[in-house]
Design a protein with these regions (language model features):
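Conserved catalytic or regulatory cores that recognize and/or transform ribose-phosphate-containing ligands
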Residues: 1-145
Length: 145
């Protein structure tokens, strides 16, 4: 998330850990950026557009990867606190709404479902919850083979 220290990667990491702990498969934009740019110390950056330009970071490519995962694999999208300020998270949320996927919002380190119309459902995401879940971290319920 631009404008946040380290592009808010620590919050992405914490959310991914929480959601994996609840049994979800997680597609984290932060983890994907670290894989795509392994020589970059993302956690030392200030989170500016200038840094992305210097790195030749393809925001369009990254968003394409995120949205492709959401469209093809995700059961829902988890939105970090402050997601409304992120162009990418707003796009991911809009795609989730268009596809009738569940959306979950983080409030005080807990996850709650948002209804398709944006209303607060008040249902807390718990381990073993039937539905799956991107500041968008795109999620999918883990299934045993």
């Amino acid at each position: 998330m631009r404008g946040y220290k380290a592009f808010n990667f620590p919050a992405f990491d914490k959310a991914a850990e929480q959601l994996r702990g609840l049994g979800h498969e997680v597609f984290s934009p932060a983890e994907e950026s670290c894989k795509a740019y392994p020589d970059v110390d993302w956690y030392s950056l200030e989170g500016t557009d200038e840094e992305l330009t210097k790195l030749k970071f393809g925001l369009g490519d990254a968003l394409c990867d995120d949205l492709t995962y959401i469209c093809r694999k995700a059961d829902g999208v988890a939105l970090l606190e402050g997601w409304e300020k992120s162009k990418c998270a707003r796009a991911e949320s809009a795609v989730a709404v268009s596809l009738d996927l569940n959306r979950y919002i983080q409030v005080s380190n807990k996850w709650y479902r948002i209804k398709a119309n944006g209303a607060w459902a008040g249902e807390q995401l718990e381990k073993g919850y039937v539905s799956g879940i991107t500041p968008g971290a795109a999620m999918r319920r883990a299934t045993a083979c």
